[in-house]
């Protein structure tokens, strides 16, 4: 009995000791400086300024130094960049960019489009906050079809091409767009479907051509000499007559009994 009580009280003592040991570790963190902060309310500076310079955020295009080479469009492995060029109506020798769309929601931020750009027109920014109600609002259109921009002519001797501050164009777009605005229509409306053609009425069968008149008999040719008659063929031998079948013998009639002379 004493051992049972001693074991019971020892179990209670171990439980209380382990409880306060774990709680002391938790309480020790209350006096420490937190290593995490609540985003985005309590950051000491904008998060984009805390990111490394080579961070790959939203893509930005400086149309002032874009050559329209479409190297970025060809390098994109998922086809999120669409570029269209046309000749300027006023100057046919000058090409203009009528479409430069980047689907930021589809982009995988690989950076392959930035590497082949000869002037650095397209660059990754440190902007990443793009919360929108409609995903189509993340398709950035850097060219206006109604007001296209001319392509930039590259200076082969230039070592640097000045551009606008990196991230300023994307930041301006994100700040002016409401998160719940209606989705734009990027695709042209579908052309109306042509009306189904009714089957044409069957044409009446063509009249049969009239029978041609019989041709006039040709002039009788002079009678040819009669051909010599062929010798008559020898008559074929008559087929041998089959032997007549023997007549069936009729059964003989029974003989009449002889008359008894004593019966007279």
Curated annotation (Swiss-Prot):
Subunit structure: NDH-1 is composed of 14 different subunits. Subunits NuoA, H, J, K, L, M, N constitute the membrane sector of the complex.
Lineage: Bacteria, Pseudomonadati, Myxococcota, Myxococcia, Myxococcales
Entry's cofactor comment: Binds 2 [4Fe-4S] clusters per subunit.
UniProt membrane topology term: Peripheral membrane protein
Catalytic activity: a quinone + NADH + 5 H(+)(in) = a quinol + NAD(+) + 4 H(+)(out)
Keyword terms, alphabetized: 4Fe-4S, Cell inner membrane, Cell membrane, Iron, Iron-sulfur, Membrane, Metal-binding, NAD, Quinone, Repeat, Translocase, Ubiquinone
Domain 4Fe-4S ferredoxin-type: 57-86, 98-127
Family to which this protein belongs: Belongs to the complex I 23 kDa subunit family.
Pfam families reported in the protein's UniProt record: Fer4_7
Residue segments, region Disordered: 183-264
Annotated EC: 7.1.1.-
Cofactor field: [4Fe-4S] cluster
Protein name: NADH-quinone oxidoreductase subunit I 2
Molecular function, one GO term: 4 iron, 4 sulfur cluster binding
A single Gene Ontology CC term: plasma membrane
Binding positions ([4Fe-4S] cluster 1): 66, 69, 72, 117
Cysteine pairings via disulfide bonds: none
Comp. bias intervals (Low complexity): 197-264
Enzyme class, broadest EC rank: translocase
Chain's role: NDH-1 shuttles electrons from NADH, via FMN and iron-sulfur (Fe-S) centers, to quinones in the respiratory chain. The immediate electron acceptor for the enzyme in this species is believed to be ubiquinone. Couples the redox reaction to proton translocation (for every two electrons transferred, four hydrogen ions are translocated across the cytoplasmic membrane), and thus conserves the redox energy in a proton gradient.
Binding site for [4Fe-4S] cluster 2: 76, 107, 110, 113
Main location: membrane
Gene: nuoI2
